Amino acid sequence: MVNLTIDGKQISVKENTTIMEAAASNGIPIPHLCYLKEINEIAACRVCVVELEGKDRLITSCNNVVKEGMVIHTNSPKVRRHRRTNVELILSQHNCECVTCPRSGNCMLQTVANDLNILDIPYKMKIEKQPWNKEFPLIRDSSKCIKCMRCIQICDKVQSLNIWDVEGTGSRTTVNVSGHKTIEQSDCSLCGQCITHCPVGALRERDDTEKVWDALADPNKIVVTQVAPAVRAAWGEELGFKPGEATVGKILDALKRMGADYVFDTCFSADLTIMEEGTEFIQRFTSGELKDRPMFTSCCPGWLRFAKSQFPHLVKYLSSAKSPQQMFGAVMKTYFAQKLGVKPEQIFTVSVMPCVAKKGEQEMDLFYEEYAGKDIDVVLTTRELVKMIRASHISPETLEDRESDRPMQEGTGAGVIFGATGGVMEAALRSAYFLLKGENPPADAFRSVRAEGFNANHGVQEADFQIDDITVRTAVVSGLGNTRALLNKIEKGEVHYDFVEVMACPGGCVGGGGQPIHDGEELAFERGKNLYQLDESANLRYSHENPDINLLYEEYFEKPNSHKAHMLLHTDHLESMELYGTGYCDYSKK
């Protein structure tokens, strides 16, 4: 242990602890802007400076470790003076139109400036704004960038895509898309991790709330909404709900109050995805098609974008099943439209998702039908949902639990855990076991695929399962850097699997790029626990036991992987890549 004194308090901490960590663990927070533990420890902002007795110059606390006998002052007059100057200099190159910024009230720079009581900027403002296509799902406002380099590091070290880079020198230094490309030309997966790790409002998702307001006000539109499993684990964080209070039923109630005609839980179409994907896996596995390469899940659009740009030769091993979002849209504009006796184009489908990449998926050309338009018309992130609730002047405490509308009312625990890494695999194996043996396995028989406790540096969970005389080798991976490492091992023949689940965001959808932002906190696994608890308490825990799913097959699709199911619930990723490249629309024409 190392003994030192911080602000007059004698403390003991482990060796190699940074000064910032030592102070924080003893109730002394040191302000900072650029620091991300183990990801961005470059001390670029100089806001975390502290005074070390015996040293003339201030030192940064984020990347200097403690030493025996140190006496440190985190808020001396000298520290406050230098910290204030550093923040004023940052503000002089920052667009301070806070009222119109999506991060107002949740901005690290705003918080630090307020705490330092900065009421004026004594330096000449010098703000440059680079052009950006506002139709792209991910928006960057260069006038708000503080050059903290977080986006560069999170994309490089965690997601391995290197989309962002530093360009220019001196006062002209800025961050931009690497390789002098536009964002549309890059290999951006739209995971949104750069958004959730930006300390200010320089990065955000494209705001689509006005499209929804317009649809809600259109008497000729039937607005149908769906809410993804991961949203229920996070939306209440911004509205003051205690854990367990922010139910999906309250989201459905809020959407109804806003004017939605029908409200549904995406758990229904997650169950539908399991029936299609599980059946497909058994067919491909038993036919010997997977002897060289595993079948990969296909419900994460960030992963699909990554696969098509980085490992195009593996695209043929993707499941052909659409994601729950897209299956929902296809069912709404066919089966549900027939139930209502209306034309498909009258139905306006809105998805509430934890994800920025879902906005890109919604716009993919292969999900367009002339008779119905897009499967999904608009995607809102969890953050956009919260904005709309606030704009509707809905008091959160008045929300009540509402059931999904019929006939797609039921969802199972298997559908709920889609939102956590490992959940898709576990849900699929529960039903695959039934399809192979004709009986249910214990509900928790496959829980070893859950990636409990792993982080951005170790994101792979492996498990083998014996079903009679069949051994199924599985792997679960989240985070695209981890995914790249795993795929390279598969390519080299170092590991062998039959079925692999991939999620672009560390921790799965609960850690998605559209979720509420808590600076410096990684909450994916805490949110995931919430979903697993909901599964454990669910009345139904197997997708194949969902009565509304069985009714849908009886009335419309006949059986999983039927011809009609393939027409509406599946897609050919290889063909779509040949026709559309990565599958996203051409934003240059929008």
Predicted regions and their residues:
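A short alpha-helix capping/helix-coil boundary motif
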Residues: 1, 131-132, 172-174, 229-233
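Fe-S ferredoxin-like electron-transfer domains
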Residues: 46-190, 196, 203-218, 222
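Iron-sulfur-associated redox domains of electron-transfer enzymes in respiratory
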Residues: 13-75, 79, 206-590
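Eukaryote-biased recognition of intrinsically disordered, low-complexity regulatory segments
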Residues: 1-9
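A generic secondary-structure micro-motif detector
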Residues: 9-10, 99, 131, 184, ...
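Short, well-ordered turn and helix-capping elements at secondary-structure junctions
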Residues: 8-10, 179, 336
